A protein has these predicted regions:
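Residue-level marker for the onset of beta-strands and adjacent loop->beta junctions
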Residues: 5, 39-41, 68, 99-101
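Amphipathic alpha-helical segments
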Residues: 13-29
Length: 120
């Protein structure tokens, strides 16, 4: 049995969050809807493998996402860093004790993002 993964972020910052993930990870809109009481977007990676999706859902409450991190494995972390605009706040890359290299970002909602190379 095959699975894919979809993670949902509910936020009052729908447009800003959608634009952030499209800009940083070159994601594409897989689905988008906008009705009076239901608004959101599902983003996918451009490669079309459909193994992971990110749903950004419009909500009135700004949630506390402390303790949550979204982790993206990069084939070449140095090349990824070079694609980032200078205004993107970041920390690293940092070598971790197990040999992987981590770059730390934070999305508009305070969700911790780790982009890493090496390991699983």
């Amino acid at each position: 049995m095959a699975f894919s993964l979809k993670t949902k972020i509910t936020t009052p910052r729908l447009a800003e969050t959608r634009d952030y993930y499209i800009r940083i990870f070159d994601m594409v809109v897989a689905e988008e809807w906008n009705s009076p009481d239901d608004k959101g977007v599902i983003l996918a990676f451009r490669d079309g493998k459909n193994e992971a999706f990110l749903e950004i859902y419009d909500g009135e409450t700004a949630y506390d996402f402390s303790g949550l991190s979204l982790q993206f494995k990069a084939e070449n972390l140095t090349a990824f860093v070079e694609t980032l605009d200078p205004d993107v706040e970041r920390r690293g890359p940092v070598e971790r004790p197990w040999g992987s290299h981590y770059l730390y970002l934070t999305d508009p909602n305070g969700v911790a993002i780790i982009v890493y190379e090496g390991g699983l």
